[in-house]
A protein has these predicted regions:
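Intrinsic low-complexity, repeat-rich intrinsically disordered segments enriched
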Residues: 1-75
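Extracellular jelly-roll beta-sandwich "head" domains, especially the C-terminal globular C1q domain
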Residues: 54-204
Length: 204
């Protein structure tokens, strides 16, 4: 194998297209480990093929859900939701046994969401009066939904989401919910497709 050493490769006068590799080429390597390949400002990279290995990963990421049994929510009491099972947790950043918090150790912007399926033990069609799930950061509410139902519902499934900055060390997220029942006590339904909480880092 021969080696070509030069400073600049350019097209001849009258041509504006350079072809590197032809019918015998299978792989073209640019640089070796530790090298930097600079793309100057104003240059356009036009891709008509398949690009792999670019971009970043949407991690840390997790999704947890309420499992085993429905969770009691005291009447008009803002209660932390105990999402006690994990669908996934890429960086072990979610506590599913004690504080039910997500504390990512990578700084950035995160998309955070929760789905809470609320109902009452009475089970009637007029027993659920009010429901408000909320996402908190470091103990302060940053997003919530309010459903003031009067006396018209048996079950409701509000979804709340927000994009939030996390410092990658001490910032944490958790979910609280308040339910008011005309009759019976408030509850959240368990199940991976019901009451859940998740987040992932956004590539910016």
């Amino acid at each position: 194998m021969s080696k070509l050493e030069t400073i600049t490769i350019d097209t001849p006068s009258g041509s504006n297209t350079m072809q590197i590799g032809s019918t015998n080429t299978a792989t073209i390597n640019l640089g070796v480990s530790g090298d930097t390949i600079n793309v100057p400002a104003g240059v356009t990279i036009a891709n008509a093929g398949t690009a792999t290995g670019f971009g970043g990963a949407n991690t840390p990421a997790f999704e947890a859900f309420l499992s085993g049994s429905d969770q009691d929510i005291g009447d008009s009491v803002n209660t932390r939701v105990a999402f006690n099972s994990e669908a996934f947790d890429t960086d072990n950043a979610y506590d599913n046994s004690t504080n039910y918090r997500f504390t990512p150790q990578t700084a950035g912007k995160y998309y955070v969401y929760t789905l809470c399926v609320g109902f009452t033990t009475a089970g009637g069609y007029t027993d659920l009066a009010y429901m408000s799930p909320e996402i908190k950061k470091n103990g302060t509410r940053i997003a919530h939904a309010i459903f003031d139902l009067g006396s018209r519902q048996r079950q409701i499934s509000p979804y709340v989401a927000i994009v939030v900055d996390m410092n990658g060390s001490s910032d944490y997220l958790d979910v609280f919910c308040e339910i008011n029942a005309n009759s019976g006590n408030g509850k959240l339904r368990n199940g991976a497709d019901k009451t859940k909480f998740g987040a992932f880092r956004i590539i910016t």
